[in-house]
Amino acid sequence: MARNQSAGRQSATRPAAVKAAKPTVGSKQLGSHGRDIEMFLGQFDALEQRRQIREGMEASIIDRVAKNLLNVPVQTLLAGLGLPSSTILRKIAREERLSPAESDRVARVLYVFRLAMDVFENETLAAKWMQLPHAELAGLRPLEVLDSQPGYDRVRDLLMRVIYGIGA
């Protein structure tokens, strides 16, 4: 009987260990700097993306998105997303995770970047578009309005209008 209880305990702890082993966006487990971004955008389904956001992406994703996707200083990305610089830079230095709210803002940048890539078919053009003021955003840059869901919705709408040939 003790053996069965022991086995039961082992199997009860096993799922937790498996869950802990799942890599999160920004972690070294997913490989090279671009691999985690690529996986989040292209290979993770909506439920896995949700899990990644709720568990918190690794803070290092901020550095990767700023430098490797958008070609902007980290401070520019943080300001655009309305994230506190000192807190996020500390999390990056300590290799900590972002909060779900912080991760959600980063995810919005990734979603918009992917959509901009679909429109412009070029990473450089997509990144530049996200940094240019737009009349339909009251002169703000798309990157500056991704700190809220309504801002994200507006930027997504602009890109969808381009895709479908409706004046933007």
Regions found by a protein language model. Name each.
Residues M1-A168:
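Non-transmembrane "mature" sequence context
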